[in-house]
A protein has these predicted regions:
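Alpha-helical scaffold segments in soluble metabolic enzymes
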Residues: 10, 14, 67-70, 149, ...
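Canonical P-loop GTPase G-domain recognition
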Residues: 114-169
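Conserved G1/Walker A P-loop phosphate-binding module
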Residues: 1-57, 73-75, 79, 101
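Structured core elements
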Residues: 10, 45-46, 107, 137-140
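Extracytoplasmic
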Residues: 169-179
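Conserved nucleotide-binding/hydrolysis micro-motifs of P-loop NTPases
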Residues: 27, 51-54, 86-90, 112-117, ...
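Conserved C-terminal guanine-recognition region of P-loop GTPase G domains, centered on the G4
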Residues: 35-41, 63, 67-137
Length: 179
């Protein structure tokens, strides 16, 4: 799950050896696509969802956005793999924070680390993991770099599904209203 054009389908293809259409524009993936891969004798089913910016419905939401939102909100996933574009982290983390608030087992995947580096953007996955309260794995899906580490992280999470500690802190008045 992630924003449009963050490399979800490229990662899906790399993990499943599929050949789903990849494009640099929104709306390429318009339905959920199911695939499988094996890691250490474990069959893992993954779902490639259309890109969304938010879990909030809006009148401008397209059908593909509803497909992704409904899949997550209907609690169909055992583990969320949230793919984010490392070169545009701030925009991508809006969806990440919404997923963290849902208190679901999650891994954040920093994709396109090569593009981030080309723009002199440095991200420490360990520090980001500590801040978010869930595993963060850095990859370059287009070059299949980091996929072994990601598979190991998925396998470990599936062995011991952990809810991320909620690191999101609101202003005091908002926290009081939430209580």
């Amino acid at each position: 799950m992630g924003n449009p054009n963050c490399g979800k389908t490229t990662l899906f293809n790399g993990l499943t050896s599929s050949h789903q259409t990849v494009g640099n524009w929104p709306g390429v993936t318009v339905e959920r696509i199911v695939g499988e891969f094996t890691y250490k004798d474990r069959e893992i089913t993954i779902v490639d969802l259309p890109g969304i910016y938010s879990l909030q419905p809006s009148s401008a939401s397209s059908e593909d956005e509803r497909v992704a939102r409904d899949y997550i909100l209907q609690d169909e996933a055992e583990l969320i793999v949230n793919i984010v574009d490392a070169s545009n982290l701030e925009r991508n983390l809006y969806l990440t924070t919404q997923l963290l608030e849902m208190q679901v087992p999650m891994i954040v995947v920093l994709n396109m680390l090569d593009m981030a580096a080309a723009h002199q953007i440095e991200i420490d996955p360990h520090k980001l993991s500590e801040a978010l309260g869930c595993p963060v794995i850095g990859i370059v899906a287009a070059k299949e770099q980091g996929l072994k580490e990601l598979c190991a992280a998925i396998d470990a999470q599936l062995d011991d599904l952990r809810i991320p500690k909620n690191p999101i802190v609101f202003a005091d008045d908002v926290e009081a209203a939430r209580a």
